[in-house]
């Protein structure tokens, strides 16, 4: 109904202090009426067709019911005015007594009808629940910072918005914004972008209370929406810095900062511990250096971080742009990293401080990440896309929990790297075409290892996913130097090691394979697995027969539960000698005969695999072992030139195992058969048909038939 819409217009005029002409009012009314449904139904609020007491409520109602859009109405009015040949008559503006036209013309910001020369001046004047409008792009003439208690300003629910189009605030040398115990919302997703140009800003490390270009200090709550932060080359610290409280970054862009960090939040031990809320989402980080695009450093506070649906590209430092640092830290962390995309990112100097951590809880959830083309340029341990303080544990030395779900790490240096202690759970993740041989980590003594996974301490639980077509000097798919990895399922194929361990290189670590298949991997030694630690197999675990498990001196495979595949693996020992244990059965009755048929031995001469419980005690082998054994041939000689019927076929005897003489009795006319003897000229039988040969007869034998004279 028209009357109601006119009331809406009046309410709009009153609440927004807009100067709406009668012509504009009529056009707006007509536009609103056009947006009613065809049946002309009128709408009411709270059951009344009377005065509307809230334009916002009515707008929300109309948006839901009739797709009402104030922006669409205004656009229609602007278009109609542009087509009108008559110039509109400007209404004389009434200025407050304390504002002259000259002041308004020179003012870059306004609060209500009061204008201020720059953003800093407006912040010194703003009160709770007020909005600062940036009406002109300008350079700040002074900082708004926390220096002394007498200069500290606190305010709540203040907004900072651009007005009349995109606006830029340039921050000259040493000029910055630092909010203290305040709540501020900067920018809006529904407004034009607000840009902060930091090209002249330098922030020395000594200014540790407000060492970012824009700071949320002492428990402030600051939200950034639809903002651009650029040209931070002179920064020695951060574009956005939060310390205790809440920082939210949504739909923002950070670009061209070769000497700083995009977003950082921290909790210094100099202040009372509290909880930090840290959220970065729907934003773009392009060309961020120093210690990462997003960084959080905590000392004693509890922290909740959410980093979601961002794009990180060309970020040279920090795990594809995300990194954390603890020094020292004792409180709990909960971090969720989800739906981010990383392109052409590097890792540089990482975790140069903060090696003392005793966290009560460190929980990180990483999901739906896409990493493409990152590199390692650091002299620190060779890690690739993610390192340490996130889902890998790094220098966090206790109680670290992390999960990685539905991620893809491709065309980088390493897929996943975990250092020190901790526990990482991986689900439905792909590590593909990474090349650890390109890592620049010579000073660590670990250059080029672990194309898919680099594990040096801690635990990784791989529930599902694929590790394929990665390259490394050692450990094409997985490299372990200490630590433990549990493989429950997955496909590990096409990985290549220049030296050892095409699938896995295990040096002093523990591999527990309960499922999954290694196939088509290549290496000079150990195409499937190079096992120089502990390697346990069970269930559906499989190393395809085209790959092998190489066993250095005194190393073997442990079978923890019944294996399903036949064969489950092919083993290659460092040396072929009788009694060399290659498999140990560690479940049930613990006898080698329970599993020995599920393993193959890479062929060499007469050697084969036999169960230890079949062997004589004089062999010195364990009953739970599967060992290397020699295979001996037992031949039967009729010991006459005459024709003999029913001669036994050759049989086999194994090292330190008993073997039965054939039960078949040869027949030579009516000449009585006396038995078999190793001596061709013997007069009596040494062995009778069906009798066992001695276990210690570890040689090829020819048994001669002995006939009665």
Q: What spans do the regions from the language model cover?
A:
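Extracellular/surface-exposed low-complexity segments
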Residues: 4-124, 368-393, 400, 406-407, ...
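Short, T/G/N/S-enriched strand-turn elements that build extracellular solenoid repeat scaffolds
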Residues: 119-126, 140-153, 175, 535-540, ...
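Extracellular beta-strand-rich solenoid/capping regions of secreted or surface-exposed proteins
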Residues: 128, 140-163, 168-193, 197-223, ...
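Extracellular beta-strand solenoid repeats
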Residues: 133, 159-161, 170, 178, ...
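Short glycine/acidic-rich loop motifs that flank beta-strands on beta-rich extracellular proteins
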Residues: 142-145, 165-166, 172-177, 198-211, ...
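Small-residue (G/S/T/A) turn/hinge positions that recur once per unit in extracellular repeat modules
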Residues: 181-184, 219-220, 245, 269, ...
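Secondary-structure capping and domain/repeat boundary segments
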Residues: 628-709
């Amino acid at each position: 109904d028209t009357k109601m819409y006119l009331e809406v217009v009046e309410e709009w005029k009153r609440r927004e202090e807009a100067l709406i002409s009668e012509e504009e009012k009529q056009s707006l009314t007509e536009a609103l009426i056009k947006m009613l449904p065809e049946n002309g139904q009128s709408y009411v609020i709270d059951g009344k067709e009377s005065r509307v007491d809230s334009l916002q409520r009515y707008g929300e109602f109309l948006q839901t019911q009739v797709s009402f859009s104030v922006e669409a109405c205004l656009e229609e009015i602007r278009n109609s005015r542009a087509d009108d040949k008559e110039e509109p008559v400007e209404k004389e503006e009434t200025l407050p007594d304390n504002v002259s036209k000259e002041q308004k013309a020179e003012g870059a910001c306004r609060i209500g009808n009061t204008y201020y020369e720059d953003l800093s001046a407006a912040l010194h004047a703003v009160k709770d629940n007020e909005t600062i409008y940036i009406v002109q792009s300008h350079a700040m003439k002074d900082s708004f910072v926390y220096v002394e208690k007498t200069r500290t300003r606190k305010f709540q629910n203040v907004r900072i918005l651009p007005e009349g189009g995109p606006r830029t605030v340039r921050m000259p040398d040493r000029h910055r914004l630092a909010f203290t115990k305040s709540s501020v919302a900067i920018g809006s997703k529904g407004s034009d972008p607000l840009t902060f140009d930091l090209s002249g800003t330098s922030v020395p490390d000594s200014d540790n209370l407000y060492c970012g270009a824009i700071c949320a200090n002492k428990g402030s709550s600051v939200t950034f929406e639809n903002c651009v932060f650029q040209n931070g080359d002179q920064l020695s610290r951060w574009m956005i810095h939060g310390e205790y409280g809440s920082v939210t970054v949504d739909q923002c862009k950070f670009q061209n900062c070769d000497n700083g960090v995009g977003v950082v939040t921290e909790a210094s031990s100099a202040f009372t511990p509290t909880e930090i809320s840290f959220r970065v989402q729907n934003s773009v980080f392009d060309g961020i250096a120093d210690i990462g695009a997003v960084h959080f450093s905590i000392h004693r506070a509890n922290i909740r971080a959410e980093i979601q649906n961002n794009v990180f590209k060309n970020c040279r430092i920090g795990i594809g742009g995300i990194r954390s640092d603890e020094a020292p830290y004792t409180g709990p962390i909960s971090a969720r990293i989800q739906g981010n995309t990383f392109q052409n990112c590097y890792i540089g100097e990482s975790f140069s401080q903060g090696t003392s951590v005793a966290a009560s809880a460190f929980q990180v959830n990483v999901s739906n990440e896409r990493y493409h083309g990152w590199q390692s340029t650091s002299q620190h341990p060779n890690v690739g896309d993610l390192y340490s303080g996130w889902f890998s544990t790094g220098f966090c030395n206790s109680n670290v929990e992390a999960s990685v779900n539905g991620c893809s790490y491709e065309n980088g240096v390493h897929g996943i790297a975990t250092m020190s202690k901790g526990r990482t759970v991986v689900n439905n993740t792909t590590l593909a075409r990474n090349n650890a041989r390109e890592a620049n980590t010579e000073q660590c003594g670990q250059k080029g290892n672990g194309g898919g996974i680099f594990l040096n301490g801690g635990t990784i639980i791989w529930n599902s996913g694929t590790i394929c077509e990665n390259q490394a000097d050692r450990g094409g798919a997985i490299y372990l130097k200490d630590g433990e990895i549990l493989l429950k399922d997955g496909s590990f194929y096409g990985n290549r090691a220049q030296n050892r361990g095409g699938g896995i290189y295990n040096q002093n670590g523990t591999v527990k394979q309960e499922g999954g298949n290694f196939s088509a991997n290549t290496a000079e030694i150990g195409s499937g697995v190079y096992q120089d630690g502990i390697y346990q197999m069970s269930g559906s675990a499989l190393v395809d027969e085209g790959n092998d498990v190489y066993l250095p001196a005194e190393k073997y495979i442990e079978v923890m539960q019944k294996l399903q595949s036949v064969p489950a693996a092919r083993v290659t020992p460092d040396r072929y000698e009788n009694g060399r244990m290659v498999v140990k059965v560690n479940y049930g009755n613990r006898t080698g005969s329970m599993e020995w048929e599920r393993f193959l031995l890479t062929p060499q001469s007469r050697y084969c695999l036999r169960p230890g419980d079949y062997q004589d005690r004089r062999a010195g082998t364990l009953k739970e072992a599967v060992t290397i054994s020699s295979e001996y041939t037992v031949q039967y000689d009729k010991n006459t030139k005459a024709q003999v019927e029913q001669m036994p076929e050759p049989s086999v005897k194994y090292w330190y195992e008993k073997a039965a003489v054939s039960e078949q009795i040869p027949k030579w006319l009516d000449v009585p058969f006396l038995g078999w003897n190793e001596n061709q000229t013997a007069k009596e039988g040494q062995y009778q048909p069906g009798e066992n040969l001695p276990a210690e007869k570890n040689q090829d034998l020819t048994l001669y038939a002995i006939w009665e004279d």
